[in-house]
């Protein structure tokens, strides 16, 4: 539930995905 500062509208989460973030509502979130 914490925004990671990366969007995933056109491409999936990349750098933040390494930190455990996942795509939700076009934004990368962690918990």
From Swiss-Prot:
Keywords: Disulfide bond, Knottin, Plant defense. The keyword Disulfide bond applies. Pfam families: Cyclotide (PF03784). GO terms for biological process: defense response. Disulfide bonds join 4-21, 8-23, 13-28. InterPro entries: Cyclotide, Cyclotide_bracelet_CS, Cyclotide_sf. Signal peptide: none annotated. Contains 3 disulfide bonds. This is a cyclic peptide. Belongs to the cyclotide family. Bracelet subfamily. The presence of a 'disulfide through disulfide knot' structurally defines this protein as a knottin. Probably participates in a plant defense mechanism. This is Cliotide T11. It comes from Clitoria ternatea (Butterfly pea).
């Amino acid at each position: 539930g914490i925004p990671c500062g990366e969007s995933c509208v056109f491409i999936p989460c990349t750098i933040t995905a390494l930190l455990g973030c996942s795509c939700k509502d076009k934004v990368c979130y962690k918990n």
